[in-house]
Amino acid sequence: MTEVYSKAPATVGQVKLSNNGTSNKAYSVPKSPAPVRTDLFSKIPAGTKIQVGSHSVIIQRYLSEGGFSHVYLALLENEKPFVLKRIYVPDKTALQLVHGEIETMKRLKGHRHIVNYIDSSALYSKSENRYEVYLLMEFCAGGGLIDFMNTRLQHRLTEGEILKILADVCDAVAAMHYLDPPLIHRDLKIENVLLVAPNSYKLCDFGSACEPLAPATTPDTIMFLEQNIAAYTTPQYRAPEMIDINRRQGIDEKSDIWAIGVLAYKLCYYTTPFEQVGNSAILKASFSFPPFPRYSDRMKRFIATCLQEQPSHRPNIYQTLKEIMEMQGTPLKLPDVYGGVNASTYNPPRAPLQRTPSGSLTPLSSRPAHTSLPPIPTVQTTSSNVPPVNRPSLKSKSPSVSNILSNQLSPISSANNDVMARLQPKSPIPATKSYSATIQTPRSPSLRRADSTSHIIKVPHLPDTSVKTAKTGASEIDVLSRYPSVEEIDKITDKIEVSKPLRNSGPLAFKPFEKISANKQTDLLQNKPEALLDLENRFLPKPSPKPSEFSSSVGSKQNLSMDIPSVQNVSTKQKSTNDTDNSKLKINKPLTGGYAPLPSRPNRMNHSVLNEKSNKEFVRGPRVLPPIEVSSSKMAGLDIRKEPFTPAVPSAKSGLKKDQSSEVANKDVVSKNKDNIAILADREARPQLLLDDNNDSSSSSSEHLISFNNHTGNKILSRQTTSSSIDSNNVQSNIEFLKGLNATHARSTSQVSHTQRLQQSISTSLERVKSNTKKESNSPRQVSKLKRPIGASNKILSGKFGEAFKKFEFGGEKMSRRRKSETKKNLVSILPDTEVDEYPKASNEWIVESEELPQVHETINQYRKSCETQRSRKSHEGSNDLERQPSSPDTVHPGIKRSHFIRERVKQLLSDANKHHQSPSDSETDRTPDSSSIHLPHIERLNLFHTKSESLE
């Protein structure tokens, strides 16, 4: 049932019920268990007008559904909100239970911590043979306590808030226990506590309330009691005497005290103390306190005292409320109707005991037995902020009638004010009075257990427990020794709490914890994960220092409060290990001194995947340095087939010179100066800086530049060819030379001599290769071949078509030597420092290892036959297309056949070469050949080699 808040107090109207007055049958235990729920009636539509007793209400909206009821928000004629509860009653037995709940609410009406009763009525349906009871009560707008707790999952309830909730609930329970005869709620739980206003709570749901139940003695009564407890109580809040009926201890007010202890535990830790174990732990009262959240030791002792296994060891409601008010620091104005005796209906107190200064218990022989009580044990707390528990004073005077009326309204005394005045004692009761004299003089009007016409108080029979012999006192000491002492509670607390605060050092000691946390953060910074190092490599403008140096620099500039992940994602870790070679390609970090990022050589198996990734990820490519010309003396010692690829990383000693040289190189890339002589002279003198320490650095850097272009895509290739001129002598592989040359507008006259050198080579091999029509110039496979990295080219040279490559490209060792001698005579060098035999020496370094394979010869023969058959048929095509001068083989029209194009192109090159030889000049600075007439043969010849290689594969 969901009830809730009204700012204006509820108006109490005239109550008109069929039976007037108080009925004892309403509070007796029903003879049959609770009815089994069936399908309830349909919901009442909004706007329906219903007469409930003397109040006419209009249904506003549907709120919730209970066990056997529907709850609606209704408005009176004065538009005040109330709650209308429509209860489903299948038979007369269930009607008796509902009538008992209504009677309980009527008796408790007007209490500040109990939901107020307004009116009720009952209807009988002959057609359906059932009853419907309408109960009108107070509306609580704050909702349930459980909803409020759900809003505090991150920040749990404070101890002050818990004490306020317990104080309001215990005040409502005390009103029930103070009745004559007393009523027990039997269903105390957080679901039955409602929030009226901020920090104000009320108790509801009195359907399980009844008078105390006597111990069961026969099998029939045991079975009946078990069924009744199972129907009207909540399992996790049941006391041990409710679970084990054979103990024959009776179910009285001490069962509600147990439920208060469970309620307090759940308010603290959001769970019940016996939820994981079950009934076996309840029977033994075995539980523990979690280490978090932290509450005071006095709060834990209060919960432990309420959850005692024996009912007689639990405090009564007055002692419970007194302890709560003392923890709050608020005086308790509720009278003690028990006269200082920890008694209940069916569980009388034990013999009184006195605790000596040493901590032992000794019997009291000088005082009457009933005046001593086993209260909540007074324990020395570990915190100086918590005051010790005070026992109820035995010498205090009884409260006056005016104080009772001003502080607490008793349901019984409100009906009989004249009797209450006569029950006030005229003098305090001396401590030495006898037991009979004490019970003849009542201490409070709430202690009255009879009707208003009798002045003799009927109290539960208490046996004469005055200690007469030492033997009796010893037996009682043994019984009460089960009370938890200070040492026992401290041992339990030490076992449960993981991190207990130091004694005599304040509430908490955090200095060791802060020291440990600081050390942990320092260790985390020193042992940085791979992801953090990767971020440093990406965004730091200089090479990242060691982890220890980085941690020290971070610690000097920033606080150590940042959180560093200690566990890396598996997918991220695998990706970083698989793409280690290409990790730097995806980083556009700042360049120091003009150096471009240095990619590593990818594997041949994954070069197509890497090219696909690079085309997608590179929106803006990094700057690419032009290749560097290397002299033949440096190039002669290179063996590309054997040497692994190592990027040219600048050393620390020559860092300044390298930065300056790279800066000049980048200016050469962007510059469009027509004075090519000064640029070439500058570039010729520049490589010596990179060749001081390592002879292989020039080779690796030239390989690196070509490989970097392969991965950055077509956009970077076009950007490079429009801004720089690359010499063919700088490239070790013709395949890689093709990749770096797409459209170059300035070339040196060394290419003229190179063209002359190629005349004999092309004329001898033209008949074998000019008719290759299997692959078009713009085929997708050829484009992918253009992007083959350097590592793949080394493997191609040692592949199955190595013999064809050697014969076509170099014409054998003898032919290479003959070309070398002829070109030395005819070559006119542009620069005086340039050696003319670089290319032959570089070409002699190619070693073909698979030229003797029979499958290579067979493939070459098939290729030659196909070329011969198609040569005559394709010779006449494409004559009109020679006027086009494409800058790269990729731009050749598909209609122009390659064989015919090569043949006609060679003729044009021969004629151009003769023209240059007829007009030689000694001035090297005025010689700038036309790029359109000199550059294309190399591209076409090398693309021809690609076409040949693809056909062989």
Swiss-Prot record:
The modification Phosphoserine is found at residues 872, 875. It is found in: Cytoplasm. One of its GO terms (biological process) is actin filament organization. One of its GO terms (cellular component) is actin cortical patch. The keyword Nucleotide-binding applies. Pfam families: Pkinase (PF00069). Coiled coil: none annotated. Residues 343-402, 427-451, 538-606, 641-669, 748-791, 864-953 are annotated as: Disordered. It catalyses: L-seryl-[protein] + ATP = O-phospho-L-seryl-[protein] + ADP + H(+); L-threonyl-[protein] + ATP = O-phospho-L-threonyl-[protein] + ADP + H(+). Residues 355-369, 378-402, 433-444, 558-575, 748-766 have a biased composition (Polar residues). Residues 547-557 have a biased composition (Low complexity). Signal peptide: none annotated. Residues 656-669, 767-778, 865-884, 937-953 have a biased composition (Basic and acidic residues). The active site is at residue 187. GO terms for molecular function: ATP binding; protein serine kinase activity; protein serine/threonine kinase activity. Its EC number is 2.7.11.1. Residues 57-326 form the Protein kinase domain. The keyword Acetylation does not apply. ATP binds at residues 63-71, 85. Keywords: ATP-binding, Cytoplasm, Kinase, Nucleotide-binding, Phosphoprotein, Serine/threonine-protein kinase, Transferase. Belongs to the protein kinase superfamily. Ser/Thr protein kinase family. PANTHER family: AUXILIN, ISOFORM A-RELATED (PTHR22967:SF57), SERINE/THREONINE PROTEIN KINASE (PTHR22967). This is Serine/threonine-protein kinase ppk30. It comes from Schizosaccharomyces pombe (strain 972 / ATCC 24843). The lineage of its organism: Eukaryota, Fungi, Dikarya, Ascomycota, Taphrinomycotina. The gene is ppk30.
